[in-house]
Amino acid sequence: MIDVVIRAPLLSISGYGVHSRQVFKWLNERQDVNLHAQIVQWGNTSWMINSEYENGLVGEVMKASSNAETGKSDISFQIQLPDEWDPNLAKKNIGISAVVETDKCSSAWIDSINKMDAVIIPSEHVKQTILNSGHVTTDLFVIPEWYFEEIERNETTALESEKICL
């Protein structure tokens, strides 16, 4: 079993909250993962507190909530702003962030990026902005923030395929 901690605004009603729950769901469905959740605030957003929300996923998040001991987990996924990441949370640490919505990135965030083992970002634009903002020593992986789960499960009848451009 892989011991995994996810630190993220998992109960937040926000874009980062949605993305956090997508990552949580993926990890929670894996048979080889022992998952712990560290739920953090995202700005001044409201929280989902009904365990039935999102087909029971909110309840699964609540059950996984714990304070995993720093440095004990095999891997962490931290869905936060770069200066909020903890490079010592687990043996391997993956930062996930939208980072910027402009063409400039803070040098302090470049320093935070370089302390992680890898960073997942949502677009080539963000990747180029980071690379143009300083010397980056950490691998950057572009993974879009959202996808149709029906496509992953090959449930094409659940979607109007003519409306999906792949």
Residues covered by each model-derived region:
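Short hydrophobic/aromatic-enriched beta-strand-loop microsegments
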Residues: 94-95, 137-144
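Short beta-strand->alpha-helix junction loop in the catalytic core
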Residues: 142-153
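Extended catalytic core of nucleotide-activated donor transferases of GT-like folds
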Residues: 5, 45-131
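Structural alpha-beta junctions
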Residues: 27-36, 117-124, 136-139
